[in-house]
Amino acid sequence: PYFKVIENCYHHLDMLFTGLSTFQSFQANQFLKENYGPELFKDIPDCDVAGMIMGRPYNIKGEFFPDFEQHICGISMNDIMKTPIRFCVVRNRFKSEALLGALRSGIITHLVTNDAIAQRVLQNID
């Protein structure tokens, strides 16, 4: 019952606040790597993952991996995209590729980052 109450709240959000993750940070977490990695990423080549946002991996083109959604426990992609403000903060220069993919996906509506990261993203657009 508790999760149903929360799930109903997801349908009426005004804002989401998030950060980005890299696949390397997922792999650095021994527990996640050993217990979830083999199943979640079995059909996804490591080099194809540009980043992760709200638990979902995507490629540099901003495409989310479709088979991944069934493993998500929490807010659905549909509810994420219906939320009008999706605010993201990126402050690590090593996340420029993750940021570029996320921006291409359309999942971010508002962004806070610094000039150096923005410049790195612009350099990688082509």
Regions found by a protein language model. Give the residues of each.
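Conserved phosphate- and dinucleotide-binding cores of soluble alpha/beta proteins
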Residues: P1-I125
